[in-house]
Amino acid sequence: MIEYILMGTKKHGCLIDNRKKEIIYYQLLSLYEKIVKEPQQLLIKYSDIKKIKICYGLTTGARFDSAQITMEVLTNNNTSYDIPVTYNSTKNKDILSFIEILKSSNLLIEDPYNIFSLYPETNLDFIDFIKFINKEHYKKGFEYPQTTG
């Protein structure tokens, strides 16, 4: 069983490590960030995590489309971090390993779009899968709370 995975790189990526029980988000994106001394990596211990919500992003362009899976990590002190999980170099097997590792982490995971249950069963490529998820999400429509008045 795989216990850790680096999605992306140590310049821009996300390490999920069940051995050390931590998530590290590497964000060494630009010289500007280094100069202004913004944090270049974010370390979150599993013990500090209240829950993780699995989200997606889809951008439809004129020349090509792009898709992304992100984790919205909510800590015990109610700080929220959006951490990208998929990058340009991400392969299908990497996404499957990410799902397996995060499921085995014993963290509270909220997966409102059923990405973890549907992706391992699909034959679609990643972008088409996210388009499918997006279509299903909007097909259901928006549910607004009822008001009295």
Regions of interest found by a model, annotated:
Residues M1-L42, F129-T148:
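Anionic N-terminal interaction surfaces
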